[in-house]
Amino acid sequence: MKAVDDHTLEVTLSEPVPYFYKLLVHPSTSPVPKAAIEKFGEKWTQPGNIVTNGAYTLKDWVVNERIVLERSPTYWNNAKTVINQVTYLPIASEVTDVNRYRSGEIDMTYNNMPIELFQKLKKEIPNEVHVDPYLCTYYYEINNQKPPFNDVRVRTALKLGMDRDIIVNKVKAQGDMPAYGYTPPYTDGAKLTQPEWFGWSQEKRNEEAKKLLAEAGYTADKPLTINLLYNTSDLHKKLAIAASSLWKKNIGVNVKLVNQEWKTFLDTRHQGTFDVARAGWCADYNEPTSFLNTMLSNSSMNTAHYKSPAFDSIMAETLKATDEAQRTALYTKAEQQLDKDSAIVPVYYYVNARLVKPWVGGYTGKDPLDNTYTRNMYIVKH
């Protein structure tokens, strides 16, 4: 990597990466101020020390309370920025998020909207409820290396026994799409085909799942028992309760719910000391590899501990593809391999549901990556 001149950066890749240009908008490729880091060391991110190149700069930061940004007069397009200051509040509870919104304390929510409040809010303030496609998949992650989950029959039974329609339409009821794979079908560069089982009725899926469990040695007299891990969240708890009930009702699997705080939850998944875990992945960039690369055998994000030479080989071929049609076909093949191996239990493709005050102008919600920039917004007189 080298700077050719003040406005040109040249990057030489070790191998062809057709989607490289999409990676450049990811925060990990943002430039950092060398002089500020050398001067302030670990305190270079503090207000007064940090140097930014965006429309806003850091004014105040109180850990676990708020982050305040103010308009940057040195931003190249500062003349087009309207909002002078924006405050971000770290709110962990979905219900608290809505309550603070309704009290007038905040102008826009960020968390998942509470299941029990969504329909009520749609009736009471329909113009303030925004629901848009989001490049994320909610799924249950199976520990592919731990017996008995290293048996594809057991993994497939869990996949088939999950009633996505009930989860999406009855439990969550916010417009999410039932998922049949890992990569959302509306991802740029994806032309995915639905697997055969997705066209079956839930009754047929349950029958096939029971057959597979019986082949693996599990019956009504000797049922499969699993621990379902989820991180602390109102939503994840409700979905975990529903999932455990569905697996019990549909295919006779006994489920014990295990709750952990976020950091412990991540450690448990990385260490592989779990059976099945709540999981979700949101794209870092709008291209299938943002999902598929996380399932490579050597990926640090592969907490399903899925190891497939066949899948790895397909993904290696995508880098050698000479045109978009070839890559698209290989992405489809890779998804089919994940489905054949039942590496995960896909549940639904997200929508982004949030509350936005009517006086917030410029918010569209149309970016599937949810890149929402305050510099594009304004406040209408009210």
Describe each PLM feature range:
Residues 6-12, 54-55, 83-85, 135-180, ...:
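Alpha-helical secondary-structure segments
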Residues 2-7, 13-85, 211:
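Gly/Pro-rich hinge or "lid" segments in bacterial periplasmic/extracellular proteins
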Residues 18-24, 52, 215-235, 277-280, ...:
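Bilobed periplasmic-binding protein-like "clamshell/Venus-flytrap" ligand-binding domains
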